[in-house]
Amino acid sequence: MRPAAAKVPKWLLLALSALLPQWPAASAWELTILHTNDVHSRLEQTSDDSTKCLNASLCVGGVARLFTKVQQIRKEEPNVLFLDAGDQYQGTIWFTVYKGLEVAHFMNILGYDAMALGNHEFDNGVEGLIDPLLRNVKFPILSANIKARGPLAHQISGLFLPSKVLSVGGEVVGIVGYTSKETPFLSNPGTNLVFEDEISALQPEVDKLKTLNVNKIIALGHSGFEMDKLIAQKVRGVDIVVGGHSNTFLYTGNPPSKEVPAGKYPFIVTADDGRQVPVVQAYAFGKYLGYLKVEFDDKGNVITSYGNPILLNSSIPEDATIKADINQWRIKLDNYSTQELGRTIVYLDGSTQTCRFRECNMGNLICDAMINNNLRHPDEMFWNHVSMCIVNGGGIRSPIDEKNNGTITWENLAAVLPFGGTFDLVQLKGSTLKKAFEHSVHRYGQSTGEFLQVGGIHVVYDINRKPWNRVVQLEVLCTKCRVPIYEPLEMDKVYKVTLPSYLANGGDGFQMIKDELLKHDSGDQDISVVSEYISKMKVVYPAVEGRIKFSAASHYQGSFPLVILSFWAMILILYQ
């Protein structure tokens, strides 16, 4: 008779198993995801702040450098997907001239596997998306929450998809796309595209992939970091979220450049069903290449995820063939920069002496262009969704003379707006706007850059008052009205304002805007906005209209010292 086997206590088995090394399952599969978002026409390398490259040794990004890094990773690693989360369009002269053809050409060369539609892909209307991009790319473009109707439904059918199943290293991976449902307020998609709620549209598409036995699913889209996190939490079956739109920088450890991380990379969201879902973005402007490693078990569950954005600095060489191609395409840009956009029949005063002290007609022209660029008709209750513009006087760097036929070229505008920023859309409470206008004149008379030029706003200052109490009157143009009129600013009301990205990020001391903004959507390149407005108008003649006034007691405050000096100089001359 065999002796009975001694029973080992459960607690001892658990303790021993905890001490044993945890080897990954034999069927575990690893995927490398390379990703970009919000590149905004930065085909050439740029300076560290994404403006024009002035010192090549300090410059970053560009498609020639991106190509080098992507090719290196593809050679070294077996299972690689290269994805873009939208907004390749808009941002530099490249898009102004080529209107998306350059995007299709260089994205094809880079070998992207899929792209989600961003809001800026609609900036030139649906035709400006179909012909340059959708008909020319060699990879799928995705969005599950955009639905076409009417005649457009047939025209655009099959040119973009809700999802795509890709084969990678013997496995299948599903990609579902999404686009900000606010695109009709941010761009020009027309009336025959409906932008549905992202989560409601994604869930049935993910469910469909699940019925096809696709158990590894990436949500790729362009709705901002907050929506990315909600999708990770709410959409059952999504394993990874690759996002864009909010230009979010995530990083684990010490960041390699000046961007401050909004969280660790990847950012882990606990889904409602308990799964841990990695969420990533890669900042913007092609400065970084997102690099995410994900390990799946045989059921498609994420076991681990790790990585970091790769800074594309000068330590990574630019591919010579791509660089030569860029230079060839650039010839047309150089010719364009000297072509006439339109004419002015008045002097466009962009001088420091004017724009940092009082209303200047160059500031009025810029603000009029910014509001015109945001003309939408989203609701019969509103004539437009935004009526207000602010621009820091220090950002206006040059006048344009009406003499010599008053010709305005891209080069002229580059002298006026040399910093290569964007004109963005934010939502602010009235109380924040009031603080901004107090900041505008808190050290008035010192030729500082924070003095605001405006559109859709009437402001009256009394410079004799103490700083931070100098705004006497502040009125804003209504939007929910059939006949626009100026109404007193309400402190608790939320307003939409178009402004330079520099101000949205707290530049010139406008920290209250950065800290208190309720929403921030990136916009179009500053020069492009003004150039397109001038081209549309053909002839411009902006006036000084009384948008900015000073109370009678302080009207001559800025020039008072000069008046006194002139008086005493005259006395000396008379008595010599």
Swiss-Prot record:
Binding site residues for Zn(2+) 2: 38, 87, 119, 222, 245
Swiss-Prot/TrEMBL catalytic activity: a ribonucleoside 5'-phosphate + H2O = a ribonucleoside + phosphate; a 2'-deoxyribonucleoside 5'-phosphate + H2O = a 2'-deoxyribonucleoside + phosphate; dTMP + H2O = thymidine + phosphate; CMP + H2O = cytidine + phosphate
A biological process term (GO) from this entry: adenosine biosynthetic process
Signal peptide boundaries: 1-28
Record flagged with keyword Disulfide bond: yes
EC annotation from Swiss-Prot or TrEMBL: 3.1.3.35, 3.1.3.5, 3.1.3.89, 3.1.3.91
Positions of disulphide bridges: 53-59, 355-360, 367-389, 478-481
Residues binding AMP, per UniProt: 356, 392, 397, 419, 502, 508
Site feature Transition state stabilizer, where: 120, 123
This protein's record includes keyword Transmembrane: no
Cofactor dependency: Zn(2+)
Binding annotation for IMP: 356, 392, 397, 419, 502, 508
Residues lipid-modified (GPI-anchor amidated serine): 551
One Gene Ontology cellular component: membrane
Keywords: Cell membrane, Disulfide bond, Glycoprotein, GPI-anchor, Hydrolase, Lipoprotein, Membrane, Metal-binding, Nucleotide-binding, Signal, Zinc
Location relative to the cell: Cell membrane
Maturation propeptide residues: 552-576
Binding site for Zn(2+) 1: 38, 40, 87
Tissue specificity annotation: Expressed at high levels in the placenta, kidney, lung and stomach and at lower levels in the thymus, spleen, skeletal muscle and esophagus.
Enzyme class per UniProt: hydrolase
Main location: membrane
Subunit relationships: Homodimer.
Biological function: Catalyzes the hydrolysis of nucleotide monophosphates, releasing inorganic phosphate and the corresponding nucleoside. Hydrolyzes IMP. Shows a preference for ribonucleotide monophosphates over their equivalent deoxyribose forms. Although AMP is the preferred substrate can also hydrolyze UMP, GMP, CMP, dAMP, dCMP, dTMP, NAD and NMN.
Protein name (record): 5'-nucleotidase
Organism annotation: Mus musculus (Mouse)
